């Protein structure tokens, strides 16, 4: 896949390393010259573009048109939304992903066309919520040999199984 990583530092470094293991073609766009020099020195198999990924001409010059995925990792949520919307609307990018600092922006960004908005706080809150539900289940379930098996199956809202008891 052809993937663009826009912005970021530590998270971009980690992500680039993982994506390179998957043999993806990577383009990085970053406005920090020192970071771009670092990336170019460490990775000879990626395109490193120095410039502001919020600028249309920078992304045009980077050659992102028709890419499979754009991943926006800027500090400001608004920048990440702008990058993702620009990628979809102007450059026909198939999928957009971004990080968000404010967990309230996850659902808003997805409503505004970002394919996946990721917030560590949002994910942690959902994990805690799910863990507490499982803990409550375990407290009321009779245990056989101190073992419990809990399965979760997600179904579409129009599935005939919705609201029905499954044995």
Question: For the regions a protein language model found, what residue spans apply to each?
Answer:
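Cytosolic regulatory regions of ion transport systems
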Residues: 1-167
